[in-house]
Structure formats: structure tokens, C-alpha cells
Amino acid sequence: MNMSKQGIFQTVGSGLDHILSLADIEEEQMIQSVVRTAVTGASYFTSVDQSSVHTAEVGLHQIEPLKTSVDKPSSKKTQGEKFFLIHSADWLTTHALFHEVAKLDVVKLLYNEQFAVQGLLRYHTYARFGIEIQVQINPTPFQQGGLICAMVPSDQSYGSIASLTVYPHGLLNCNINNVVRIKVPFIYTRGAYHFKDPQYPVWELTIRVWSELNIGTGTSAYTSLNVLARFTDLELHGLTPLSTQMMRNEFRVSTTENVVNLSNYEDARAKMSFALDQEDWKSDPSQGGGIKITHFTTWTSIPTLAAQFPFNASDSVGQQIKVIPVDPYFFQMTNTNPDQKCITALASICQMFCFWRGDLVFDFQVFPTKYHSGRLLFCFVPGNELIDVTGITLKQATTAPCAVMDITGVQSTLRFRVPWISDTPYRVNRYTKSAHQKGEYTAIGKLIVYCYNRLTSPSNVASHVRVNVYLSAINLECFAPLYHAMDVTTQVGDDSGGFSTTVSTEQNVPDPQVGITTMKDLKGKANRGKMDVSGVQAPVGAITTIEDPALAKKVPETFPELKPGESRHTSDHMSIYKFMGRSHFLCTFTFNSNNKEYTFPITLSSTSNPPHGLPSTLRWFFNLFQLYRGPLDLTIIITGATDVDGMAWFTPVGLAVDTPWVEKESALSIDYKTALGAVRFNTRRTGNIQIRLPWYSYLYAVSGALDGLGDKTDSTFGLVSIQIANYNHSDEYLSFSCYLSVTQQSEFYFPRAPLNSNAMLSTESMMSRIAAGDLESSVDDPRSEEDRRFESHIECRKPYKELRLEVGKQRLKYAQEELSNEVLPPPRKMKGLFSQAKISLFYTEEHEIMKF
């Protein structure tokens, strides 16, 4: 018998608890009246009984002295957060570089009746969770090559394959490691994932060939691959019956009447808002894994693949194997399926600036077998991209800054940090033009790879070792923004190259450094990189293992350096808020008739091409990260000498709206428009409108990287409509151009691989759009259908033809009579008196003279 001993105060307290409080919250019973009405329940079940009696209870739950089962009782953690084998595949020697060995929707594969976790998931509607995966391979010592395993939020879309290392990733090297583990948080535009009807996948695991598989004689031509996955931090919500459905401040309308500055945040920001109040939006990192991005160094500090070259057994000692210009714009990797120019993260960021400076860090990752042996020497020659280095011998190269790498052993990567050595404080981005002026240079020199010791190996293994080249930047400063889409570089003055990036302390830590100017003090010390900020001692040696995130975090310092000094700029041009606070072109449209409206959605999706999708800089920027939330500033420029009344309004996603991208009469009432919030204007009194679009959405965030899934909802910020009245034929053409910029309340979460160069689409020229019929030519006055019918009628009938011929005869008769009665002096030569030059039209956009 189980007896409990209580003191007098414990007994009294227990009695008071029964009198004054309810029973246990999990199993509750309360007698409410003398007619025995009771409310009972357990968890999410409640029962109201009108003729109830007390519960009959006998005995208490007992603990076994001798356990019948010694395993831990099952729970959500043991059942729902254990590893399950979700995929098996073979990596073959026939797989080319960047071949996708596996592309897995991890959550969909975990939702499987073969796995115990489905017993929990199928009875719930929504969930929040993280994902952890393991990828295992079993190579032999006679096999060499590498794979990259990257967890991509939603879909890879048009991101550069060479920049997959921007995502949470693991590198598999047959000579170094045979397993990688990746753990990711919940990243989604919505607060929870709907198991029965998902909007789009949460996480996609892609496994691609990073270095082709080579084998020795008699070795298997494949390596097997297994993928394990589990949920982490699993939260289940919405109990549901079992379903047979399977998983699927101040106000202003314009800056001045005809002048508006789009160049910087202070002048481009809107002070008028479509919001109900002059409200602010609070920060919320809960759906973005807490990874908020504010600076472009988030991308420039991550290793991304730029080039690959072989170290062959036929290479002689002192032979130059690879020559790499030292600038951040270089990349050589391409792919055919899908067709990509695989730009690196560093080149993608730096291509958008006029000037750069900083220390570039090259990572050389080798893929040998355990039976290969050899050494490489890496040498930096200061100068520019045009210097001739073909005559520099191995002995001469040891005079310059150099490092030697032994490819044999457990360390796979040489990290070579090139110090900033230049005759100018900055280098210029010359890829925007083809002409070259003496003194204008892009690179600070060249990096040369020499054969230091010949490659030796048994005859039954491959006679070469592949080397991947990555690049990053330390103390990087870029300034003076521009728009430019880089092509695959045959580097200026040389057709060989490659670059790499250093890895941060943790993968995907945003803003690992603030570049040359600190955020705390924009006028303070410059060029403070990770090593300077953290104050740590530089590690001895430049060799590391890039496959291991713990070892890859070493701060590179190959050679001793001085601190770079004080920046000449008081503003950090690499700040996202400064860069995108400048207004960038969004779209343009022209009205042809009176009492019409035009609606255009602001969609971030990269699957929508200009002119209906984001063009150029906006397209590039909104695909650099997974999630966006917060308001946007819209600047509308009005062109044409008109006196037209207009009204603009903003419609959040999900509500009634007129047909987008069509000039038409509005089907919406004035009550509906003004209830949404409208702005009235007159085009004679103002030439521009600057207005803030509020963050009004039922979503947590929107995304530009859904690749067609959820494009209509989860990638659209909202819709803007403009309606005009009192537009007549005395007015010139009426055109609107729209520009978009971010605000200080904008938030950007979770970095993505930048768009590959093939997906960078610019706005079409005005002439091409006029030729395509998208815009009306500004040369012709708008005419109604009635005018055109009248003109065609006149041309057909030719009225007064006979009368005009008769008048002509009489005038000729009178002229002849007048000549016969007068003696005229001899005619004088009037040189060029009535000569007329050819008529020409000068079109300013194309800078061409069209002569008629």
C-alpha cells in the first residue's frame, strides 16, 4: 500500500486547493450546480454533461521496480526527430561536371508511410521545423573526385551553380571525407508548412558533381550514395481527422514640379504613404532563421567556384599550369543543362560597382587519391592584367610572394591571400567598355601556378589530379554603383584564371564584415576585416581543409600586411540600404485614351521577364536572398505636356483588382478605390509622385525565387493602379515611368546563390518596344477611331477635284498674259536661295540620325 505522509500545513493547503481551484488541466471536472451539470475534458476534447456524477477512481499509476522494457518511452522526439533513409543513388564516372546526382524534396520524402514520423504528421495540418541531413559515400583509395551537397530553400531557380556554396552545404572529397552533415532552420514565406496542400517545397537538397569521378584500373566505376534526413525542432499544429489526400510623418506629393532625385536614399525616399497611418513595421526574423542581411559582404566572403584545372603527370618541373588575373570579376565555369554562365558570388556583387579594392583570397582544393604525390607553387606577380608573365621561371617566381602546397595528406586546400598592392588606391571595372586607356586597369597583378614537384602515382590510378579554384575577399571595398551583367571572362589580357572565397566562422553568417567602412562609425577606421575586428591571432600556415566547416573558418593571412589606413568615403556603398535606397527602374507605360486605368503588379519572381517582370538591377537584387518583408518606395515620373487629372491606389495581394498590364476602363467603384487609399494629382502641377507602398500582406514574407510555384501569391508584393481623366487631343502623349527603392524598414533574410549571367535581363530599349507595339511612338499624336475613319473617307472621295483643276487653268492663263505684256530683265543666279537640307530626326536614346 502506498502511503503518503503530510504535515498539518500540507493537509490544509491541499484542502484549500481542492476548494478554490480547478482540477488538473489535462483531465478536468467541475460540478457546476446541484443538477449535476459537469464540464469534462482532456487536451483538445471537451464534454458538457447535464446529468453527471463524480468520477469513480481506483488506485494510482505505479512505477515498475523491475522494468519490463528498458527503452525510453516513445515521444515526439524519438518518433519524429530520428534519421530516416530517404534516398540512395550511384555517382558514376560518366557524370560530367555539375551533373545533378540527386534533387530531393526532403519534406515530401519524409512524409512517407514507411517512416514512423508520418504517424505524427498525417494527423496534423501545419508544422514548423528544421531539417538535418547526412550524405554518405563509400569511395575506395583508388577513386578521386568530389561532390557538393547544398540545401536550397524552395528551388534553385536561376541561381548560379558555381555559387552553390552560398547555401548551407557540404563538400565530399574522396580523399578527405565520406560524409557531410547539414542542419537548416525553417525558411518560408508563411508561418507554417501545410502538409496536405503545400504552397511550395520548404527545402530542396541538390547533390552535384564538383569534380568528376576518376578511378584506378580494376576499380568499380561508381560510388554509392545514401541520404539520411530528419526533422528538428518539430512543432505540430492543427489536429485533423485522417485524410486520404496525400501530400501536395510629413506629407508631400513631389519633390519639385519637374525635378526629382533618384540617386540616393535621402532624396529618393517617399514621405507620402498609401498606409492608413504614418506607421512603422516591426522586425520579425522568426521565419528567416534569424539570418537578416544588411551588407553585400554576406556574399563576397563565401567560397564560390570560378575555375578548374588539371595537374597532369606530364607537367614538367617549372611549367606554368595556370595564370589567374587578380581581380574580383573573373569566372570561367559554364554549364549546358541548364544553360548557365556560372558567375561567382564575388563577381556578381563587384560587377555592380565602378571601383574596387581589397585582399583577394584564393582557395585551391585538390582531389587526389591516397596514392598521388606532388607539389604546386603559387606565386603573385604585382602589376595589372596586361603584364606578360610567360617568361618568368620557377626560380624567378620564388622572388615574389609565393607558397608551396603538398597535395598528399589529410589537408586538401591551400589558402592564398593576395595583399592589396597597387599604384592607385582603387582599380576600375573596365568590363563595361571595350576601349582601353593607359593607366586604367582592373587587376592588381597575376597569380601563377607552377609545377614544383612532378605528379607521381601508380599506373593503375588516374594520371591527373583536378584542382578547384575559389575566391573571396577580405577588407573589400566597392563604391560607385552601376548596372552591368558580366560574361564568362576571357580575362583582360589573358584567357586563364580563377578565384575563391574564404569561409566565415559559421556557414551563411550574414554580414561577416562591413568592408572598408564600419557601420558603427562611417567616418572611422577603414578596411577592418574579420581578423582586425575579432582581434584574433592570425593562424600559422595557409593550409586547411575546406570540406570541414570547423577548419575552414581559419582567417587567411598568407603574408604579413600593414593595416590599410583610413577610407576616403564617409558612406558605405556596400550597405544594402544605401545601394538599394537609390531608386532603380521598374517599368513604363503610355496612355492613349481618356478615362482609362493601368494596373501593374510588383512581382519579385525571376520567372517573369521584363517588361512585365523586374528588370536589370531589381531582378538581380531580389534574387540574392530568399525572403523579403517591409515597405517599398515608389517614384512615378510623368512625361508629356498634359493637363490631366489622375488617381493612384495600391491593392494588396488577394483582393479585387483590374486586369494587369492592360489599358482599360476600370471595373472598380470609386468607393472601393478610396477605401484602399488613393492619391489624387494633376499632371500640369506636378511631374512626379513619390509614395511609400505599405507592407500589407497575409504572408510572413514574399520571395522572388519560387520558380513558378506560388508566383501569383507568395512572390507578389502588391499591385499599383493609375487612372486618368480629362485627357484630350490637345494634350501630348502621357507616359508614366516607375522606379523602386527599399526603405530602412525593409528586411532581407537568408542569402541565395546570385543569378547566373544568362538570367540577367535588362530593360528593352524604347525604340524596340515601340516597334513591338508595346508603346506608342511619341512622334504621332493620338487620334481617335472617328478621326481615322474621316481621313480615309476624304482620301477616297477627293472632294473639289474638278474645281481645283479649273482654278489651276485660269491661273496659268493669267500668268501667260502677264508675261507677254512685260519685258523682264535677264534672270540672276540666286545661289542656294531656296535650297533645303535633308530632313533628319535625331533620336537621343540610340544616338542615331535617321535621314529621309
From Swiss-Prot:
Residues 766-836 are annotated as: Involved in P1-2A pentamerization. GO terms for biological process: monoatomic ion transmembrane transport; symbiont entry into host cell; virion attachment to host cell. GO terms for molecular function: channel activity; structural molecule activity. A motif ((L)YPX(n)L motif) lies at residues 167-171, 200-205. Gene3D superfamilies: 2.60.120.20. The record marks 23-24, 245-246, 491-492, 765-766, 836-837 as: Cleavage. Viral protein genome-linked: VPg is uridylylated prior to priming replication into VPg-pUpU. It comes from the Viruses. GO terms for cellular component: host cell membrane; host multivesicular body; membrane; T=pseudo3 icosahedral viral capsid. Keywords: Capsid protein, Host endosome, Host membrane, Host-virus interaction, Ion channel, Ion transport, Membrane, T=pseudo3 icosahedral capsid protein, Transport, Viral attachment to host cell, Viral ion channel, Virion, Virus entry into host cell. The keyword Transport applies. The record marks 769 as: Important for VP1 folding and capsid assembly. Belongs to the picornaviridae polyprotein family. This is Genome polyprotein.
